[in-house]
Amino acid sequence: MNNIIVGMGEALWDVLPEGKKIGGAPANFAYHVSQFGFDSRVVSAVGKDELGDEILNVFNEKKLKTQIEQVDYPTGTVQVTLDDEGVPCYEIKEGVAWDNIPFTDELKRLALSTRAVCFGSLAQRNEVSRATINRFLDTMPDIDGQLKIFDINLRQDFYSKEVLRESFHRCNVLKINDEELVTISRMFGYPGIDLQEIGRASCRERV
């Protein structure tokens, strides 16, 4: 078995007032892991379009290994605008390529060689990518030192209690910030307790 570290989920373009740049938490995770000299992969999907080709070219230029399928959906974009106070507002396009990541034979082979994977909630907003992520997690060999990192990304209304609970069950590492802890506490009925205890309660959802 290899010690491959995977970032799985959305790979997209953030379209900012000053121009576009590649975004997506899983892609960023895989890139930063690679900068420490580890063998990483980005697993996602892009469209058969110019924006998709650009993403693949940028990753290739950065020498970032990928397993990205080109599918019959447009490459994902996030339109970023600033309100009157300079706070960014995000419009995440739906029905895009990373909503439709296929589970291929090649992806199955990668799962069998993966030591750690980081996945989020945003890429599970569509049942196709959600099923692929869960199948990848289930295919990974059950060995000591294996990491299944759930990076909660509560964006717009692209999450549900059921999807979050399922991911709690499948992960063994949970990445969550204070703001997300408050949202989780309301969703799962933990009001009136401190953030540390909310974190413990969230972890108990795995049991």
Language model features: what each stretch is:
Residues 4-5, 14-87, 94-101, 105:
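Substrate-binding N-lobe of the ribokinase-like
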Residues 11-13, 34, 44, 171, ...:
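Generic helix-packing signal
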